[in-house]
């Protein structure tokens, strides 16, 4: 019977730590998280110079990060731009974008300046989830994907 109180105490400590980490992450300045997302995207693009982008592709995450940064900069993102951010063929990117829309992670709206163009943005819930996730990585001391020096990849 003494195991139950000890286990409950351990669970309580773990929960307290998770709450503290989440509060610390929430207290971070949004600009810091935007910079973190921007650096992550830059690191992923740099990696693509050395390895086949399809090999390490994560189109949904690339789209979400791109939209997250664009949202912080108040820049509209077209469907085409979001596809380009994914670093996969356009048809594949459109399928991923459709899935993200179906899951209500992104929202499509008509561009008021160009009625024939559709703008893509993060849903409020997804923006909050991306912020919380990036904040948790920062609170764990995990940096964004490294950006390598601007050296052309070796050929041959």
Label for each model-derived stretch:
Residues 111-133:
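Short, cationic-aromatic polyanion-contact patches
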Residues 37-65:
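Short alpha-helical segments that sit at the start of domains
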Residues 132-156:
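Amphipathic alpha-helical dimerization/coiled-coil segments
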Residues 1-27:
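DNA-contacting interfaces and partner/effector-binding or oligomerization modules
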Residues 66-70:
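Short amphipathic alpha-helical elements of helix-turn-helix/winged-helix folds
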Residues 73-85:
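Short acidic, hydrophobic short linear motifs in intrinsically disordered regions
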Residues 87-102:
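Short amphipathic alpha-helical interaction segments
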Residues 101-111:
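A short, conserved structural fragment
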